[in-house]
Design a protein with these regions (language model features):
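Short, low-complexity, intrinsically disordered N-terminal peptides in bacterial proteins
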Residues: 1-2, 83
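C-terminal structural segments of small proteins and small subunits
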Residues: 50-83
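Amphipathic, hydrophobic secondary-structure cores in small proteins
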Residues: 2-5, 9-55
Length: 83
């Protein structure tokens, strides 16, 4: 299954993004992220279904709460994508 991870710098940042997405009708799972994703040790990500990624990014931009990094995850691995 392909999905996107929106990286957040803190749990509060992740919760704010999740609230914006929920208000836009997009469900997202908040997960703890390791140093490989955040490059800063502990952090959080929101798992976004591939079909909702563009709309999720628009909702975050409109709400002024952007992810610090966006990663695309597929069977082939994980790669960072442009915001």
């Amino acid at each position: 299954m392909d999905y996107y991870l929106f990286a957040a710098r803190s749990v509060t940042h992740a919760q704010r993004m999740a609230r914006l997405l929920s208000d836009a009708g997009i469900s997202a799972k908040i997960r703890c992220a390791g140093a490989a994703i955040t490059e800063r040790g502990c952090g959080y990500t929101l798992e976004i279904p591939r079909r909702h990624a563009a709309r999720a990014m628009q909702a975050c931009r409109a709400g002024g709460v952007l992810p610090v990094k966006v990663l695309f995850v597929s069977d082939d691995g994980m790669q960072e994508v442009a915001l």
